[in-house]
């Protein structure tokens, strides 16, 4: 949300004087930060945008390149130079530019002046330009005799493979789907993550020399013991693909579904229509994706039982009946424990859902799933509530029922550890220490939602830390506490190498 400057603020701290708001060119709207002391050149401390990014993006660095304040050497164009800098920490600029909720923009100093720098838009431009012009990552020779297994081919697993190949390690990704991508492919609606662009960003990583074993589930198709024997280290990047059911009576009805399963069925093109009345419980980004998909799909009046929403989502059928009938709009309602303005979903996503015709009820808690004589859900009984911390407190006398043909729970998710029960911490996740190691299991490391469901950029950042821990483990080095001091390390040798320069030899004379 934009923070405006106070009325008595000296206008010399801003770009414009009062009543002078003309913009000469579009790039001034985005790239005016360097003209104010509010966004200085950070040397001793991390810029607030970078400090707010879980993946550790050098955001200030690639923005400077795009603004032509830092120029490449030789015949490299600035687009390639910006791409190299932007992908040093995050190999998915096009995807992140589209779907990341941009904590970097929340941390931007320009919020104290007029509005944040449009970081997401610039990152998407860099990523899209790279796809259009066929940019590849540098070829990496396998200089190590170590092999690392990565269990899961989502953003965390792919980011780990990217970092491992840069270090010269051989790595193999095991994934139980037909295609790589994880939540980027199966958890986010395809209209938000164009498949050709996603495929291009994934293929770039595979082309670095990553081995892939698809439709292979460790713990079922391949015993974990066999993986431990074949590989020198394992990174668990399983994701969190099991949705949590509603903790209310009746939630086990056949037409009560999870948001994760709903979106996966849509992204696999199995789900073509939805029921007439859809109720979604949540308040986060997943719930917004579910209600938006439901509104866009709509329903038809005559549906064979095999083509009902729950049968398609649960994988019992995949008939495409929608192409021969007329669609009608579905009534879609989203309930949240939080007031609408405090929902965890991105504000612009909530606004988009409202514009698409979704009804959102804030400060509402579910009490019971209403069932018919056959045990199917017919509605959700709710009441108004307040929050005591994160605990909802029902407001007496405010009960009401929302009619529903299907009810979707998008209140959280956990990992599917079937066949890996020894790794389960009892909550559907795997325990991790501060170095993203599995406690008491040497050679086992973690990254992504299997640690704790969070942002895609968080999973990418965790993967980089896990790879650092893998390297220390392979080198038999003791891991030291990661510094929390907000200091940006300027790697002079890396910069000289990037500019094709070498430190000159010199003799040290007397110094006083």
List where the protein language model places each region.
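Beta1/beta-strand and adjacent pyrophosphate-binding region of the FAD-binding site
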Residues: 142-156, 274-284
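Short cysteine clusters
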Residues: 49, 53-56, 96-100, 104, ...
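Ferredoxin-type iron-sulfur electron-transfer modules in oxidoreductases and energy-metabolism complexes
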Residues: 20-40, 58-95, 113-140, 266-267, ...
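A conserved FAD-binding loop/helix module that cradles the flavin
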Residues: 290, 304, 308-318, 447-480
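Beta1-alpha1 glycine-rich phosphate/pyrophosphate-binding loop at the start
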Residues: 26, 48-50, 57-74, 112-120, ...
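Feature captures the FAD/FMN-dependent oxidoreductase FAD-binding
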Residues: 142-149, 199-249, 368-381, 406-408, ...
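FAD-site-proximal beta/loop scaffold in flavoenzymes
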Residues: 254-278, 284, 296, 369-373, ...
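Mid-to-C-terminal Rossmann-like scaffold of FAD/NAD(P)H-dependent oxidoreductases
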Residues: 2-12, 16-19, 31-35, 39-41, ...
